[in-house]
Amino acid sequence: MTYTPRRVSKVFLCSVPILAIGFAAPRALRVAGVYHTIGGVLFVAIVAAAWILGARSIRSGRESEQRLALAGALLLTPFTLVALFWVGLGPPWETTPPENVMRYLVLLVSSIAVTGGFVLLKDALSDAGERNYSTLALAATILAGAAYLIWMSFMLGYYVVAVRDGKAPAAMNSLAEVFDILLDVACLLTYLATATFAASLGRVRWLGRGATRVYVAVNLIASFCLLMSSMSSPDPAAHSTPWYARPGFVAGIPAIPFIMPFLLGVVLLRRAGEKPSTNGVLY
Protein backbone atom coordinates (compact mmCIF):
# COMPACT_ATOMS: atom_id res chain seq x y z
CA MET A 1 0.00 0.00 0.00
CA THR A 2 1.20 3.49 -0.71
CA TYR A 3 1.32 6.21 1.89
CA THR A 4 -1.45 8.31 0.35
CA PRO A 5 -4.27 5.70 0.56
CA ARG A 6 -3.38 4.99 4.20
CA ARG A 7 -3.37 8.67 5.04
CA VAL A 8 -6.73 9.21 3.35
CA SER A 9 -8.10 6.16 5.16
CA LYS A 10 -6.95 7.51 8.51
CA VAL A 11 -8.52 10.92 7.92
CA PHE A 12 -11.78 9.33 6.78
CA LEU A 13 -11.94 6.98 9.77
CA CYS A 14 -11.34 9.88 12.16
CA SER A 15 -14.41 11.57 10.67
CA VAL A 16 -16.65 8.49 10.93
CA PRO A 17 -18.17 9.24 14.38
CA ILE A 18 -19.27 12.69 13.19
CA LEU A 19 -20.60 11.27 9.92
CA ALA A 20 -22.43 8.44 11.67
CA ILE A 21 -24.06 10.77 14.19
CA GLY A 22 -24.87 13.28 11.47
CA PHE A 23 -26.70 10.67 9.41
CA ALA A 24 -28.37 9.08 12.44
CA ALA A 25 -29.88 12.26 13.87
CA PRO A 26 -32.34 13.45 11.15
CA ARG A 27 -35.47 11.33 11.29
CA ALA A 28 -36.34 12.40 7.73
CA LEU A 29 -33.69 10.01 6.38
CA ARG A 30 -35.54 6.98 7.74
CA VAL A 31 -37.11 6.18 4.39
CA ALA A 32 -37.01 2.64 3.03
CA GLY A 33 -34.30 2.35 0.41
CA VAL A 34 -32.68 5.64 1.39
CA TYR A 35 -31.29 4.67 4.79
CA HIS A 36 -30.38 1.20 3.53
CA THR A 37 -28.31 2.71 0.72
CA ILE A 38 -26.59 5.34 2.86
CA GLY A 39 -25.83 2.81 5.60
CA GLY A 40 -24.48 0.26 3.14
CA VAL A 41 -22.19 2.79 1.46
CA LEU A 42 -20.85 4.04 4.80
CA PHE A 43 -20.28 0.50 6.05
CA VAL A 44 -18.34 -0.57 2.96
CA ALA A 45 -16.26 2.63 3.07
CA ILE A 46 -15.40 2.14 6.75
CA VAL A 47 -14.43 -1.51 6.30
CA ALA A 48 -12.31 -0.68 3.24
CA ALA A 49 -10.56 2.20 5.00
CA ALA A 50 -9.87 0.07 8.08
CA TRP A 51 -8.44 -2.70 5.90
CA ILE A 52 -6.15 -0.29 4.06
CA LEU A 53 -5.00 1.37 7.27
CA GLY A 54 -4.02 -1.82 9.06
CA ALA A 55 -6.86 -4.28 9.70
CA ARG A 56 -5.32 -6.59 7.09
CA SER A 57 -2.67 -7.39 9.71
CA ILE A 58 -5.27 -9.53 11.51
CA ARG A 59 -4.76 -12.08 8.75
CA SER A 60 -1.14 -11.71 7.73
CA GLY A 61 0.78 -9.78 10.39
CA ARG A 62 3.01 -10.91 13.22
CA GLU A 63 1.33 -11.80 16.52
CA SER A 64 1.89 -8.33 17.98
CA GLU A 65 0.50 -6.71 14.84
CA GLN A 66 -2.48 -9.08 14.82
CA ARG A 67 -3.26 -8.13 18.42
CA LEU A 68 -3.13 -4.41 17.66
CA ALA A 69 -5.18 -4.80 14.50
CA LEU A 70 -7.83 -6.89 16.24
CA ALA A 71 -8.01 -4.43 19.14
CA GLY A 72 -8.36 -1.55 16.70
CA ALA A 73 -11.06 -3.34 14.72
CA LEU A 74 -13.06 -4.06 17.87
CA LEU A 75 -12.83 -0.42 18.97
CA LEU A 76 -14.11 0.63 15.54
CA THR A 77 -17.13 -1.66 15.83
CA PRO A 78 -19.60 0.72 17.55
CA PHE A 79 -19.70 3.47 14.95
CA THR A 80 -19.32 1.00 12.11
CA LEU A 81 -22.61 -0.53 13.26
CA VAL A 82 -24.14 2.89 13.91
CA ALA A 83 -23.29 3.95 10.36
CA LEU A 84 -24.84 0.76 8.97
CA PHE A 85 -28.03 0.51 11.01
CA TRP A 86 -28.83 3.92 12.52
CA VAL A 87 -29.25 6.19 9.48
CA GLY A 88 -32.31 8.36 10.19
CA LEU A 89 -33.01 6.59 13.48
CA GLY A 90 -33.22 9.70 15.65
CA PRO A 91 -33.48 9.70 19.48
CA PRO A 92 -35.25 6.84 21.33
CA TRP A 93 -38.37 8.84 22.13
CA GLU A 94 -39.00 9.45 18.41
CA THR A 95 -38.59 5.86 17.21
CA THR A 96 -40.83 2.81 17.22
CA PRO A 97 -40.34 -0.12 19.65
CA PRO A 98 -39.00 -2.43 16.88
CA GLU A 99 -36.45 0.24 15.93
CA ASN A 100 -35.42 0.58 19.56
CA VAL A 101 -34.92 -3.20 19.78
CA MET A 102 -32.39 -2.80 16.97
CA ARG A 103 -30.89 0.29 18.67
CA TYR A 104 -30.16 -1.49 21.94
CA LEU A 105 -28.97 -4.64 20.21
CA VAL A 106 -26.37 -2.52 18.39
CA LEU A 107 -25.39 -0.85 21.67
CA LEU A 108 -25.10 -4.22 23.41
CA VAL A 109 -22.80 -5.61 20.72
CA SER A 110 -20.82 -2.35 20.72
CA SER A 111 -20.21 -2.41 24.47
CA ILE A 112 -18.95 -6.00 24.27
CA ALA A 113 -16.67 -5.11 21.34
CA VAL A 114 -15.16 -2.10 23.13
CA THR A 115 -14.51 -4.16 26.25
CA GLY A 116 -12.80 -6.83 24.16
CA GLY A 117 -10.75 -4.23 22.30
CA PHE A 118 -9.52 -2.64 25.51
CA VAL A 119 -8.59 -6.04 26.99
CA LEU A 120 -6.43 -6.75 23.93
CA LEU A 121 -4.94 -3.25 24.15
CA LYS A 122 -3.98 -3.90 27.76
CA ASP A 123 -2.05 -7.01 26.69
CA ALA A 124 -0.28 -5.06 23.95
CA LEU A 125 0.69 -2.30 26.38
CA SER A 126 1.97 -4.82 28.91
CA ASP A 127 4.18 -6.34 26.22
CA ALA A 128 5.46 -2.82 25.48
CA GLY A 129 6.41 -2.38 29.15
CA GLU A 130 3.55 -0.21 30.44
CA ARG A 131 1.63 -2.00 33.19
CA ASN A 132 0.54 0.62 35.72
CA TYR A 133 -1.90 2.84 33.82
CA SER A 134 -3.01 0.00 31.57
CA THR A 135 -3.96 -2.13 34.59
CA LEU A 136 -6.04 0.69 36.08
CA ALA A 137 -7.67 1.22 32.69
CA LEU A 138 -8.45 -2.48 32.42
CA ALA A 139 -10.18 -2.44 35.81
CA ALA A 140 -12.36 0.49 34.74
CA THR A 141 -13.04 -1.22 31.40
CA ILE A 142 -14.28 -4.44 32.98
CA LEU A 143 -16.55 -2.57 35.40
CA ALA A 144 -17.89 -0.38 32.59
CA GLY A 145 -18.48 -3.40 30.37
CA ALA A 146 -20.43 -5.16 33.13
CA ALA A 147 -22.56 -2.06 33.79
CA TYR A 148 -23.24 -1.60 30.08
CA LEU A 149 -24.10 -5.29 29.69
CA ILE A 150 -26.71 -5.15 32.46
CA TRP A 151 -28.24 -1.86 31.33
CA MET A 152 -28.29 -2.73 27.61
CA SER A 153 -29.76 -6.15 28.29
CA PHE A 154 -32.53 -4.63 30.40
CA MET A 155 -33.38 -2.00 27.78
CA LEU A 156 -33.31 -4.61 25.02
CA GLY A 157 -35.69 -6.78 27.02
CA TYR A 158 -37.87 -3.75 27.76
CA TYR A 159 -38.47 -3.06 24.07
CA VAL A 160 -38.80 -6.74 23.17
CA VAL A 161 -41.68 -6.92 25.67
CA ALA A 162 -43.10 -3.66 24.28
CA VAL A 163 -43.08 -5.11 20.76
CA ARG A 164 -44.61 -8.40 21.87
CA ASP A 165 -47.33 -7.03 24.19
CA GLY A 166 -47.90 -3.58 22.71
CA LYS A 167 -46.48 -1.84 25.78
CA ALA A 168 -44.05 -2.56 28.59
CA PRO A 169 -45.41 -3.36 32.08
CA ALA A 170 -45.56 -0.49 34.58
CA ALA A 171 -43.05 -2.29 36.78
CA MET A 172 -40.49 -2.19 33.97
CA ASN A 173 -41.07 1.55 33.54
CA SER A 174 -40.18 2.10 37.18
CA LEU A 175 -37.11 -0.11 36.88
CA ALA A 176 -35.98 1.79 33.77
CA GLU A 177 -35.75 5.00 35.81
CA VAL A 178 -33.73 3.24 38.51
CA PHE A 179 -31.41 1.66 35.93
CA ASP A 180 -30.49 5.07 34.49
CA ILE A 181 -27.90 5.50 37.22
CA LEU A 182 -26.23 2.31 35.96
CA LEU A 183 -25.90 3.90 32.53
CA ASP A 184 -24.26 6.96 34.07
CA VAL A 185 -21.79 4.70 35.87
CA ALA A 186 -21.02 2.79 32.66
CA CYS A 187 -20.44 6.00 30.69
CA LEU A 188 -18.30 7.53 33.43
CA LEU A 189 -16.11 4.44 33.74
CA THR A 190 -15.71 4.28 29.96
CA TYR A 191 -14.49 7.89 29.87
CA LEU A 192 -12.05 7.21 32.70
CA ALA A 193 -10.81 3.99 31.10
CA THR A 194 -10.25 5.75 27.78
CA ALA A 195 -8.37 8.61 29.45
CA THR A 196 -6.15 6.16 31.32
CA PHE A 197 -5.46 4.08 28.22
CA ALA A 198 -4.52 7.28 26.37
CA ALA A 199 -2.06 8.12 29.14
CA SER A 200 -0.65 4.61 28.88
CA LEU A 201 -0.29 4.93 25.10
CA GLY A 202 1.54 8.19 25.65
CA ARG A 203 4.00 6.53 28.01
CA VAL A 204 5.03 3.98 25.36
CA ARG A 205 5.07 6.72 22.69
CA TRP A 206 2.25 5.26 20.64
CA LEU A 207 0.57 8.63 21.06
CA GLY A 208 2.31 11.98 20.85
CA ARG A 209 2.40 14.21 23.92
CA GLY A 210 -0.10 16.69 22.49
CA ALA A 211 -2.52 13.98 21.36
CA THR A 212 -2.30 12.27 24.75
CA ARG A 213 -3.21 15.49 26.52
CA VAL A 214 -6.17 16.03 24.20
CA TYR A 215 -7.52 12.51 24.74
CA VAL A 216 -7.15 12.76 28.51
CA ALA A 217 -8.63 16.26 28.70
CA VAL A 218 -11.65 15.49 26.51
CA ASN A 219 -12.53 12.38 28.51
CA LEU A 220 -12.11 14.13 31.85
CA ILE A 221 -14.26 17.06 30.70
CA ALA A 222 -16.94 14.63 29.50
CA SER A 223 -16.78 12.87 32.87
CA PHE A 224 -17.24 16.16 34.71
CA CYS A 225 -20.20 17.18 32.51
CA LEU A 226 -21.82 13.79 33.07
CA LEU A 227 -21.41 14.05 36.83
CA MET A 228 -22.98 17.50 36.87
CA SER A 229 -25.87 16.30 34.72
CA SER A 230 -26.47 13.27 36.94
CA MET A 231 -27.36 15.59 39.79
CA SER A 232 -30.31 17.00 37.83
CA SER A 233 -33.24 15.46 35.99
CA PRO A 234 -32.13 13.13 33.17
CA ASP A 235 -35.43 13.60 31.34
CA PRO A 236 -34.75 15.62 28.16
CA ALA A 237 -38.34 16.86 28.16
CA ALA A 238 -37.92 18.39 31.62
CA HIS A 239 -35.67 21.20 30.33
CA SER A 240 -36.37 24.18 28.13
CA THR A 241 -32.92 23.81 26.55
CA PRO A 242 -32.81 21.25 23.71
CA TRP A 243 -31.14 17.98 24.71
CA TYR A 244 -28.40 18.38 22.09
CA ALA A 245 -27.40 21.73 23.62
CA ARG A 246 -26.79 20.22 27.07
CA PRO A 247 -23.23 18.80 27.32
CA GLY A 248 -24.00 16.68 30.36
CA PHE A 249 -26.96 14.97 28.73
CA VAL A 250 -25.01 14.37 25.51
CA ALA A 251 -22.10 12.89 27.50
CA GLY A 252 -24.52 10.37 28.99
CA ILE A 253 -25.91 9.13 25.66
CA PRO A 254 -24.84 5.44 25.56
CA ALA A 255 -22.94 5.65 22.25
CA ILE A 256 -21.06 8.90 22.93
CA PRO A 257 -18.39 7.39 25.24
CA PHE A 258 -17.43 5.10 22.34
CA ILE A 259 -16.20 8.03 20.21
CA MET A 260 -12.76 8.35 21.80
CA PRO A 261 -12.17 4.56 21.88
CA PHE A 262 -13.04 4.58 18.16
CA LEU A 263 -10.31 7.16 17.55
CA LEU A 264 -7.86 5.13 19.62
CA GLY A 265 -8.79 2.20 17.40
CA VAL A 266 -7.69 4.24 14.38
CA VAL A 267 -4.34 4.81 16.08
CA LEU A 268 -3.94 1.09 16.75
CA LEU A 269 -4.81 0.13 13.18
CA ARG A 270 -2.29 2.63 11.87
CA ARG A 271 0.41 1.18 14.09
CA ALA A 272 -0.51 -2.38 13.12
CA GLY A 273 -0.18 -1.46 9.45
CA GLU A 274 3.21 0.22 9.76
CA LYS A 275 6.35 -1.52 8.53
CA PRO A 276 8.32 -3.38 11.23
CA SER A 277 11.11 -0.80 11.04
CA THR A 278 8.78 1.99 12.20
CA ASN A 279 9.09 2.58 15.94
CA GLY A 280 8.21 6.23 16.39
CA VAL A 281 5.13 8.07 17.50
CA LEU A 282 2.25 7.30 15.17
CA TYR A 283 -0.33 9.94 16.02
Language model feature labels by segment:
Residues 1-283:
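Hydrophobic, aromatic-enriched alpha-helical segments typical of multi-pass transmembrane helices
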